[in-house]
């Protein structure tokens, strides 16, 4: 990333504090957005709202957050706001 230049955000972004359901069923809370230090892409930082998670926080590229996926033969949005 060029110092002082922040990549543009798309019009639709998750907001810190919002809760989302992953297409497989688990719930997550958005912590915020971050810029990947090597790739200059926006990342969503989120935490699981279920017990025994593999990590305290996760990240996912913002462009994947609302993308469509096929799960058990059904098209779903990767994360749906609850």
Region spans (language model):
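Mixed-charge, low-complexity intrinsically disordered regions
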Residues: 1-82
